[in-house]
Structures are given as structure tokens and as C-alpha cells.
Amino acid sequence: MKVIFMKDVRGKGKRGEIKNVPDGYAQNFLIKRGLAKEANQSAMSQLNAERKAEQRREAEELAEAKDLQKRLEDDKTVVEIVAKAGEDSRLFGSIPSKQIVQALDKQYNLKLDKRKVELPEPIRSLGFTNVPVKLHADVTAKIRVHVVAKQQ
């Protein structure tokens, strides 16, 4: 019997796969527990519609990520952060990704998740720093961060 898996079943199939399984296994285990449903015409057309919707959603996310990448990598987009610094232009403390995201939201009204900022270690010195941001699996942007000493 051909079935469409609704959930991942270890050793048998992943969600959305169409496979041939023994009739008894399909009726008594998979279908009864909601792990799969019979692969008839209506179920197949529903699966195809879900796949098309998923592809459309993926394309929209990619387009949004590319648009955001253009806005972030624009020459005018420089995130300025004011911090206390010593004489040797080293900061008292550091600037983590959370602070960069908050400054970006405050200055340019661009909301980002702090986990997308790929900062290997917090910024500890004054000046310009290019910070990579993973917007999508295929799209990575660079934010220019300018750390300025706080006037006393």
C-alpha cells in the first residue's frame, strides 16, 4: 500500500515522502497513529499544493534576505556605538552582538535576531569593524560598526 508520511518515522520515511509499505503495517500502525495517510488522488494533490506553498515561502524569504542585505551593506549604513574607553583606545568592557542589534534597531529601524550576528568575540577596541550577519542559508551581509569613545 502506498502511503504519504505525515511525520518522520525512524527507519521507514521522512515527512512528505511517498513510499510503498505492507498493508497491515500501514493500516494497523501508521494510519492508526496518524503517522501516515493513504496516497490517493486528493492526498497527492494536497501534498503537491503544500510543496508549492513551501517553495513560494522559501523564495519570499530569500528575496527578503537579499533586500535586507542591500540595506545593511549600503555605504550610509554605519552603526555608531558610544562606549567608555581608556587612553590606549581599548574599551572598558566590550560590545556584544546584542548591543549591535539594539543600536541597529534604534538608528535604522532594522530588526535583527542577535543570534544571526556572527561575532566570534565581542568588540573590545575603538574604530570600524565589519561584522558578518547570516540572514539566510545563502545570504550573508556585513554590518559596519563604528565604536566611538564617550566624551567626558
Swiss-Prot record:
UniProt KW keywords: Ribonucleoprotein, Ribosomal protein, RNA-binding, rRNA-binding
Superkingdom per UniProt: Bacteria
Cross-referenced Pfam families: Ribosomal_L9_C, Ribosomal_L9_N
Biased composition (Basic and acidic residues): 49-61
Chain spans, region Disordered: 41-61
GO cellular component: ribonucleoprotein complex; ribosome
GO biological process: translation
GO MF term list: rRNA binding; structural constituent of ribosome
Cross-referenced PROSITE patterns: RIBOSOMAL_L9
Family: Belongs to the bacterial ribosomal protein bL9 family.
Function: Binds to the 23S rRNA.
PANTHER family: 50S RIBOSOMAL PROTEIN L9
Descriptive protein name: Large ribosomal subunit protein bL9
Protein's organism: Levilactobacillus brevis (strain ATCC 367 / BCRC 12310 / CIP 105137 / JCM 1170 / LMG 11437 / NCIMB 947 / NCTC 947) (Lactobacillus brevis)
Gene that produces this protein: rplI
